[in-house]
């Protein structure tokens, strides 16, 4: 039976429609690939409650993790107005109130839908450690006040506590190595562990304590100085030790107290203050710290006059008297005060007051040790009036830079046992990779290991060329079907 031309056209159009539709279906099902949509972003809020001030940091990371640890970056840094929270002993509620301005700035940055699942934490360091020793109930009242403020915020409050010195040192080490790409780096479109990354040591000088943390060449013989943790699927063993009362503010307080006790008069000649400097202070304010030994016969109502003489040699001698070096005499694995320390090894980043002091003295460009020493001595020998005229608007810390600079040299060279050969291994930095160096980022990296990860959402998708081909065959199928319908319609009318 011979088909009419209408029947032949109708059959051809049906065949084209079937072939085009089948081809389109094959392209969709066979050529499709699984595409991972970008992960949602999570946020975390951390308060660093130091001895002299408090800072807030907001960190962010993808909701999915790399080897059980979040890939964290800094989104905000905010310095809280006022002193450190340990200063609010007479009115603890003000410690909590002081945090509100920075907290509001953080909440404005974080999407409102994320507020209830954003962890917030306050870690207090050496200033509160000292207050806890002096008056534990006052320390608890302050922690309760800041906890009350943060628990009322629309965030997931994880608590406020005093960090151990060892934790502060270890988290600082994590921060330095993370921002330098020693723990994880981005390569060929993915995050990978560095094959042979040289780990960097961390040197932290706060107001009340100082920390040294590094991975030594050999084993750590004193287990009390060893911290182990797991990040991005790798295990780390780090030497770390914190020296309470050896922070910048407390060492200068101790130094002045020693000068007062040795002079036995109400007028003290201070070798670390510039010649021509003079100030009056109360003895009560000097001895208001657990770091300072209080004499039995102290007249708290007496005032003290301090005169600067600008003698860096005598200043160094006085600073050395605050260390117990004899307890480590002849021992290579001992720092000072009888504390075990393996020989320093590798590169180090020095931050906090290490950086602030050397930045003021213009010594952060890795100058040789002899240049550093010469620069500090010459600065110490400048008369006070010349120093004031040379640095307007910096009166708050100006008198202390001489003592701080010389103290850093004594601490690093005679305390931590750096030498002229290893001095070039120290970099004085505030930031690395646009991120502030301190314990907070290391803490957040560790914290993300406790926050559940979210799986990436998968979608079936095609490449652009396959998508275009699919559209062409879809249009061809539609045209063939419409053509067949038209032929059928005209055929029926005939």
Swiss-Prot record:
EC number: 3.6.1.5
Extracellular topological segments: 30-465
Cofactor: Ca(2+); Mg(2+)
Topology of this chain in the membrane: Multi-pass membrane protein
Glycosylation-annotated residues: 299, 303, 362
Alphabetized GO MF terms: apyrase activity; ATP binding; GDP phosphatase activity; metal ion binding; nucleoside diphosphate phosphatase activity; ribonucleoside triphosphate phosphatase activity; UDP phosphatase activity
Annotated cofactor note: Ca(2+) or Mg(2+). Has lower efficiency with Mg(2+).
Keyword presence, Phosphoprotein: no
Disulfide bonding pattern of the chain: 78-102, 245-291, 328-334, 380-402
Keywords per UniProt: ATP-binding, Calcium, Cell membrane, Disulfide bond, Glycoprotein, Hydrolase, Magnesium, Membrane, Metal-binding, Nucleotide-binding, Transmembrane, Transmembrane helix
Record-annotated membrane-spanning stretches: 9-29, 466-486
Tissues and organs where the protein is expressed, per its UniProt entry: Present in liver, and at lower level in jejunum and kidney. Limited to the canalicular domain of hepatocytes (at protein level).
Active site location: 168
PANTHER family hit by this protein: ADENOSINE/GUANOSINE DIPHOSPHATASE, ECTONUCLEOSIDE TRIPHOSPHATE DIPHOSPHOHYDROLASE 8
Domain notes: The transmembranous domains are involved in regulation of enzyme activity.
Protein's recorded name: Ectonucleoside triphosphate diphosphohydrolase 8
Organism of derivation: Rattus norvegicus
